């Protein structure tokens, strides 16, 4: 029917497709927690360097312990949404595919906004005294600086790097990043990798001249309150149909040491 274009299930499906297409979150989020409330307090563990070694335990001796506790502050959740308003004429005389493109684009906007929230938590913390202190570089990043970032992240693995457009341009001009194998991978898959094997992700919302390196397997938790929410109604006196799409999500750090940052001014 004419109103099928704004049918809630169709809207939800199209928006999710757009979110998945533009979604970099699976590349930086270790786990996703779905809740049915607006309040959520995550857990944390802060093992010392000695704890991470797991030294031998003699028979009958006490086994060392790692303490897991809840965080002091709640995870900050953000509601993101958009209303799509369409006239009866637009629905009646236009192809459904055009509305699908529009809805997918709304989904892409939501995914990018959530990525911005995630990067902000990585850099500035989630309110539990766990903001990053970027290492200051004297000039544009060099291969030595990237290796140093890799070393600072140990014992975690540097498998993901985040950079803005300007920073990406500086990184890709490093001689080691022009490696033929890396270039071939980019041409074949569209994915950038570093000489150290870490995936290099383009995050336009990240502050320029700042690099974030992380272990995606244990750095960040995504918390979402339910799924994509869609509501639909009609304004008969104006012959308009409306659909609202919204999501509620937030982010929290899991292991603070699993992410490091570097910045430069040159």
Predicted features along the sequence, with ranges:
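Assembly/oligomerization interface modules of large self-assembling protein complexes
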Residues: 2-80
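Helix N-cap / beta->alpha transition motif
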Residues: 87, 163-167, 215, 255
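Hydrophobic alpha-helical bundles in membrane proteins
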Residues: 68-72, 94-95, 125, 161
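Extended, solvent-exposed, turn-rich assembly/linker loops in the middle of proteins
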Residues: 124-192
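Alpha-helical scaffold segments that mediate packing/assembly in large oligomeric complexes
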Residues: 80-153, 264-266
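Glycine-rich, charged/polar anion/phosphate-binding loops
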Residues: 69-70, 145-149, 227-230
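Sequence/fold signature of self-assembling virion shell proteins
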Residues: 175-266
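Short helix/loop capping segments that flank catalytic or ligand/cofactor-binding pockets
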Residues: 51-54, 66, 94-95, 170-172, ...
């Amino acid at each position: 029917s004419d109103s099928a274009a704004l049918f809630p299930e169709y809207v939800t499906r199209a928006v999710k497709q757009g979110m998945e297409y533009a979604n970099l979150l699976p590349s930086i989020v270790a786990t996703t927690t779905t809740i049915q409330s607006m309040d959520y307090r995550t857990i944390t563990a802060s093992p010392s360097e000695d704890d991470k070694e797991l030294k031998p335990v003699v028979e009958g001796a006490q086994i060392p312990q790692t303490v897991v506790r809840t965080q002091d502050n709640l995870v900050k959740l953000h509601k993101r949404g958009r209303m799509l308003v369409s006239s009866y004429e637009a629905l009646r005389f236009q192809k459904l595919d055009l509305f699908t493109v529009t809805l997918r684009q709304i989904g892409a906007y939501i995914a990018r906004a959530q990525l911005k929230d995630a990067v902000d938590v990585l850099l500035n913390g989630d309110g539990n005294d766990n903001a990053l202190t970027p290492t200051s570089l004297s000039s544009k990043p060099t291969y030595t600086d990237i290796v140093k970032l890799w070393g600072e992240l140990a014992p975690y693995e540097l498998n993901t790097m985040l950079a803005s457009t300007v920073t990406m341009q500086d990184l890709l001009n490093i001689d080691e990043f022009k490696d033929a194998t890396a270039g071939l991978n980019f041409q074949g898959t569209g994915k950038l990798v570093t000489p150290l094997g870490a995936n290099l992700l383009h995050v336009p919302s990240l502050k320029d001249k700042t690099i974030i390196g992380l272990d995606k397997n244990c750095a960040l938790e995504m918390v979402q309150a339910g799924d994509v929410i869609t509501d639909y109604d009609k304004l008969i006196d104006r012959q308009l149909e409306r659909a609202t799409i919204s999501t509620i999500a937030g982010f929290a750090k899991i292991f603070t040491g699993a992410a490091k940052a570097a910045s430069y001014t040159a």
